[in-house]
């Protein structure tokens, strides 16, 4: 009658998460909320949580890739803290980044000092 109401109005577009817009698995909305609640700054830009989520996702993927390789080397199909420890400590850059981090149930890297190894003598080769 008077042209009011929702006749012929456009249907609202399907909601799309910021993570899917950015092509990420990590939750951009949650990272944004945590940045706002954490009192890091008075205001948080729209791109900051996307960038931070992307960085966190990349680091996680890198560590899991190396830990998966460590698990496969040990003939295991499940990644355990020991595999994470081996992955991080054997990678120079990750070891520097996570140098002060302790991983529970991670153990230590196998390492025997060179002076403790048996000496290789050539006495039995020269028996003339």
UniProtKB/Swiss-Prot annotation:
The modification N6-(beta-hydroxybutyryl)lysine is found at residues 10, 14, 37, 96, 119. Its main location: nucleus. The modification Phosphoserine is found at residue 2. The modification N-acetylserine is found at residue 2. Keywords: Acetylation, Chromosome, Citrullination, DNA-binding, Hydroxylation, Isopeptide bond, Methylation, Nucleosome core, Nucleus, Phosphoprotein, Ubl conjugation. Residues 7-19 have a biased composition (Basic residues). The modification N6-glutaryllysine is found at residues 96, 100, 119-120, 126. The modification N6-lactoyllysine is found at residue 10. GO terms for cellular component: extracellular exosome; nucleosome; nucleus. The modification Phosphothreonine is found at residue 121. Core component of nucleosome. Nucleosomes wrap and compact DNA into chromatin, limiting DNA accessibility to the cellular machineries which require DNA as a template. Histones thereby play a central role in transcription regulation, DNA repair, DNA replication and chromosomal stability. DNA accessibility is regulated via a complex set of post-translational modifications of histones, also called histone code, and nucleosome remodeling. This is Histone H2A type 1-J. It comes from Homo sapiens (Human).
């Amino acid at each position: 009658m008077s042209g009011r109401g929702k006749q012929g109005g456009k249907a609202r577009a399907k909601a799309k998460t910021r993570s899917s817009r950015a092509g990420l698995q990590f939750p951009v909305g949650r990272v944004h909320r945590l940045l706002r609640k954490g009192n890091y700054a008075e205001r948080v830009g729209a791109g900051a949580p996307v960038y931070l989520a992307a960085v966190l996702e990349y680091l996680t993927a890198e560590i899991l890739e190396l830990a998966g390789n460590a698990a496969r080397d040990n003939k295991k199909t499940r990644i355990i803290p020991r595999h994470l420890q081996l992955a991080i400590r054997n990678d120079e850059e990750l070891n520097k980044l996570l140098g002060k981090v302790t991983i529970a149930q991670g153990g230590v890297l196998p390492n025997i000092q060179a002076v403790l190894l048996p000496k290789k003598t050539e006495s039995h080769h020269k028996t003339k």
